[in-house]
Amino acid sequence: MKAYQRRFIEFALGKQVLKFGEFTLKSGRTSPYFFNAGLFNTGRDLALLGRFYAEALVESGIAFDVLFGPAYKGIPIATTTAVALAEHHDRDMPYCFNRKEAKDHGEGGTLVGSALAGRVMLVDDVITAGTAIRESMSIIQANGAALAGVLISLDRQERGRGELSAIQEVERDYGCRVISIITLGDLIHYLEEQPEMAQHLAAVKAYRARYGV
């Protein structure tokens, strides 16, 4: 596990974005942990979050031409990632996001920001069922662009309804890499280093054994 990944876990724990306990997911599964990126909700949070996204993106080595943040949660993520790439990695990249509803005045259309062209790096908080990715793909393809990759904060590494995770399905269906700041495996590795969190470690490992990919 990289140092920035450990810092991200501690950041998420400190903001209660990452919590341990018993949580019922939309899938009906009872999860021993919960991740709510919506609680990164201050200016400082967003500034730090962008640095973590930028770090993961640069480390991945994936070539891209524009960042795309799908409405709504992807919008601040794309924005802060673009700022962090420019400020900390000297990479001044264009970014773009979509509106849920088309605007019929001013610049019009459903896209805001840079043109959606070339190789698109899609940034979002998590992938649950892959629905948002499929919606974004229709926008990307309609603009004649191509999906270079997807970057999210956490890969839960768990099966969907079949044998694959939603992320593996996206990689299979669109032929791109999905990268994340951290994975469930990273989280388990972190818990193994924290003796005071041993009770959570057992529950998370049991969950991975049952639902993991």
Curated annotation (Swiss-Prot):
The entry marks the following residues as binding orotate, namely: F34, F35, T128, R156
Catalytic reaction list: orotidine 5'-phosphate + diphosphate = orotate + 5-phospho-alpha-D-ribose 1-diphosphate
What this protein needs as a cofactor is: Mg(2+)
Enzyme Commission code: 2.4.2.10
- What GO cellular component entries does it have? cytoplasm
List residues binding 5-phospho-alpha-D-ribose 1-diphosphate: 26, 72-73, 99-100, 103, 105, 124-132
What metabolic or biological pathway is this protein involved in?
A: Pyrimidine metabolism; UMP biosynthesis via de novo pathway; UMP from orotate: step 1/2
User: Which GO terms label this protein's molecular function in UniProt?
Assistant: magnesium ion binding; orotate phosphoribosyltransferase activity
Q: Which SUPFAM superfamilies match?
A: PRTase-like (SSF53271)
Name the source's superkingdom: Bacteria
What keywords are assigned to this protein?
Answer: Glycosyltransferase, Magnesium, Pyrimidine biosynthesis, Transferase
- InterPro entries on file: OPRT, Or_phspho_trans_dom, PRibTrfase_dom, PRTase-like
A single GO BP term for this record reads:
'de novo' UMP biosynthetic process
Extract the Pfam families matched here: Pribosyltran
Protein family? Belongs to the purine/pyrimidine phosphoribosyltransferase family. PyrE subfamily.
How does it associate, per the subunit comment? Homodimer.
Describe the task this protein carries out.
Answer: Catalyzes the transfer of a ribosyl phosphate group from 5-phosphoribose 1-diphosphate to orotate, leading to the formation of orotidine monophosphate (OMP).
Protein's recorded name = Orotate phosphoribosyltransferase
| Lineage, broadest ranks | Bacteria, Pseudomonadati, Pseudomonadota, Gammaproteobacteria, Enterobacterales
